[in-house]
Amino acid sequence: MSADRRAGRLGVGTIGAGRVGAVLAAALAGAGHALTGISAVSDASRERAAAMLPNVPVLPIPEVIERSELVLLAVPADELPSLVGGLAAAGAWRPGQLVVHTAARYGVDVLDPARRAGAIPLAIHPAMTFTGTSIDLTRLAGTWFAVTAPAPVLPIAQALAVEMGGEPFVVAEADRGAYADAIDTAVSFSTAIVDQAAGLLEGIGVPRAGSVLAPLVRTSVENALARHDPGPTVDGGATTIDGADDERAPGGSDT
């Protein structure tokens, strides 16, 4: 085991240079981890990788995995099961390797093919939208991260969330679907409502409808959120939602 590994520093490889992957990789680098490589297929993802991670090599997926102690899977949720299974069939995963995915809807069961090869499965989803730029690194501070992991390694998932600037809370394997629905609802409905209201104002000739609505929307949303926020936990530890003590996995894809 290397001195860096003993000190808790990991070689991190990222699969997917979308808005989420590039930002989280940069956040882990900021916490002192070494970035071993990133996979990027499209022109946009290659440009993003070059902008956010200029000294990190763009490599084929198998090579990224081979180089890494922690593999960050930041791919669309619908691609995750086949990716994990295909890599397992190719013998890519190895014992003791940390495999982290960022899809809101999945817990760690989707990583079973990697786990059967001896890898350690973790699900970590930051509850925020991403631009894929350095602005997101600042926004990560204080963002809540949904974490799901087997009980013995749950502290690893929580620690990674904290290292990226976030506040971890634990979501049970069985509750990941409900969690994802909540995230989707918050994002889609808030966007639709603002678009509808702005369209009505623009229709009657109101200039800068977004600026007119901004104070009202922010205040309304803040008041609504306050009704559902009991404040910080007494012991300062990670929050746990209903069912999160499920023995299977107590406890997010480009969002």
Model-derived regions, located:
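Phosphate-coordination loops involved in phosphoryl transfer and adenosine-cofactor binding
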Residues: G8-G11, G96, G142
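Rossmann-like NAD(P)(H) cofactor-binding subdomain of soluble oxidoreductases
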Residues: D43, E47, M52, P57-I135
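Interdomain hinge/lid region at the active-site interface
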Residues: E202, P215-T255
